[in-house]
Every structure is written in C-alpha cells, then in structure tokens.
Amino acid sequence: MIRFETMAELVKLAEEKAVPLSEIVIRSEAENTQQSRFAVLVAMEENWEVMKEAIQRGVTNRERSVSGLTGGDAAKLFIRQKEGGYLGSAALATAAYALGVSEVNAAMGRIVACPTAGSC
C-alpha cells in the first residue's frame, strides 16, 4: 500500500523506488480507486481537457451567471494582461484563468472541482 501524508514522505517514496513524484501519485490514485494505471491516466487527461475548456470559455465569453451578478470580468482581465501592467502578464493571466473558471462555474458551466469548487 502506498501511503504518504507529507511532501517529505512523498519524496522519500519516490527516491526509494527511483521514480518521479508523479509516478508515486499515479500509483497511489490507482490503488485508492481500484483502477488500472491506464484508467487513472485517461481520467487525468479528461479532467485536463475540461480544465482547459473552462479556462478558454472563461477568458473569451462575456456570458453572465443566471443571477446576473458575475460574468465577463475574466475576459476583460485577460485582455488587460496582454498590455502588461503592475503585476506582469503572467500573474494577470493566471488571475484571469482563475476568475474565468469561477465565472464558468457560476454560469453553471462544466469545471473540474479539484479539490473543491468551494473556492470559486
């Protein structure tokens, strides 16, 4: 059984087995979910695609949530980040991505809630 609770324990396991950290995490997930390694990788790929779609939708659409209280701000921020600014393009783009996913979530769009959508 693969068990770790801290980064130090994860690093130690990876060193003992001479594999990357990611491999330990994949093996742990396969074990915990009783799925094959391949099934875990397929699920990870599907989640990654949903994450990318939510980001893209969030920074390009100006749709409002059902309540009308949120929506469109991520697209504005994404446009602004191309101009640079005080925080720099990378930080503004990251903020736009996070805000975009939050807005997609508020508009009842599809996101990956990992580890929780509560932060949105």
Predicted regions and their residues:
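Generic N-terminal targeting/processing segments that precede catalytic cores or assembly contacts
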Residues: M1-G109
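Conserved phosphate/anionic-ligand binding catalytic regions in large, soluble enzymes, centered on
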Residues: M108-C120
